[in-house]
Amino acid sequence: MTIQVGEKLPQAQFRVMTEEGPQVKTTDDIFKGKKVALFAVPGAYTGTCHKMHLPSIFLNAYAIKDKGVDTIAIVSVNDAFVMNAWKRDTDQRDEAVFLADGNADFTKAIGMELDASGHGLGIRSKRYSMLVEDGVVKKLNLEAMPGKVEVSGGDTLLGQI
């Protein structure tokens, strides 16, 4: 079942690259006591994610943070090495936390898994954005089609804060 507005995020683990290598971060580490703008993409470096979704987030990052958001987080079903390379290649190292959900544990726990096996991509995340306050979903914008950025971009979430 897909998570809904008003529900608490389940406990899960992500991997985040640090100078010491991949480190585990829990949902509590990321969301507890914080206001977080979470953006999920089906895959790092994929066309829509890289050319449309990510730019919409970074174009609005300062304005989102100016509205009281503590953290901007980007999650994808990729490993921490890929997410770190993607972060480095965007030159946005300080604007967002890139969360690796390599086994799709978080994605499955919130009912946002997408079977992209037909495209050779395996299980991925649906494309969405959400505003999370202290671990509770306050806003949720789920795309009807994974190749579109119509409601999950940074501009939409900014307008909802």
Language-model features: locations:
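Chalcogenol-based redox active-site neighborhoods
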Residues: 1-161
